[in-house]
Regions:
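Alpha/beta-hydrolase superfamily serine-hydrolase fold, recognizing
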Residues: 5-278
Length: 278
């Protein structure tokens, strides 16, 4: 049964969701399928990973971003993933990559066979989406039309100006604790799949849309990663929306008319158009 997502009046397209499980080996990931009431003929399929700090986050907290992706004109499968510290790196990444492969094989269940496939995520989910793009390249996996990263957690050092300058207070500890829970030991931070911003080889990745905000404490690592992708020859679009955005905390809230998440919908729609098969 389809349930309405956030109130229709706040969106150009009504968006609905239903439960959608993905069977991966012996495991079943209980996710959600988001779809516009009127699905565009050219709709792509987005595998979305919710936010949090690797040790937190749920499908419900990812609803606003998943809805925004669907409102931009895509079918979205939003997936949970194993949380740290019980499941340290690379367990969440391997689980989501297996799900990505399964979804790619079964893509015709939801969209046309030639429809583009994307990965997307916010915060820790943005980290996983960026790493999935690397894995798909390295393992000759599902061909991706693009990666959409909202304020991704990419740098475990937490030393950027935007992070240090943010009035984070105790929030700063939450990010450090999340990284510690995910990595387990410092040497794992050197792995490119764990901290994509430090990867030595970025060429050959799917086109990227990276969205951050002026007052986002993850702004600088988002911009740094976009710059490194561009230098490696990856077709990359970086969008810095105006503040106050209250990103990334606001990702878990219902977007309101004129909010930064609603304005990001236009950037996503443009990215879908630019990366659609010709």
């Amino acid at each position: 049964m389809l349930a309405p997502s956030v109130p229709e009046s706040r969106y150009r397209r009504a968006v609905f969701w239903r439960e959608q499980s993905v069977q991966v080996g012996r495991d079943k990931l209980a996710g959600r399928l988001y779809a516009p009431a009127a699905v565009p003929d050219e709709a792509g399929l987005v595998v979305h990973l919710h936010g949090g700090t690797f040790d937190s986050g749920t499908l419900a907290s990812g609803e606003a971003v998943a809805t925004t992706l669907a409102e931009a004109g895509a079918i979205v499968i939003s997936l949970p993933y194993p949380l740290a510290p019980a499941n340290p790196f690379p367990q969440a990444l391997e689980a989501t990559y297996a799900a990505l492969e399964k979804i790619a094989r079964d893509k015709a269940r939801w969209v046309g066979k030639s429809a583009p496939l994307y990965v997307a995520g916010e915060e820790a989910g943005g980290n996983l989406a960026a790493a999935l793009a690397m894995m798909a390249r390295d393992r000759h996996g599902p061909p991706l039309a693009g990666q959409i990263l909202f304020s991704p957690m990419l740098d475990a050092c937490l030393g950027t100006y935007s992070f240090r300058n943010a009035e984070a207070g105790p929030v700063g500890c939450r990010w450090a604790d999340g990284w510690h829970a995910y990595l387990g030991s410092p040497e794992k931070a050197a792995h490119p799949y764990a901290t994509p911003v430090n990867a030595a080889r970025l060429s050959g990745l799917a086109p990227a849309l990276i969205v951050t905000a002026e007052d986002d404490l993850l702004r600088d690592e988002s911009i740094n990663y976009a710059g490194r992708l561009k230098a490696a020859g990856v077709d990359t679009t970086i969008r810095v929306v105006g503040g106050p955005s209250r990103w990334p905390e606001a990702f878990a809230e219902i977007p309101r008319d004129g909010s930064c998440l609603c304005s990001a919908c236009d950037h996503i729609s443009a990215f879908f158009t630019a990366t659609a098969p010709s």
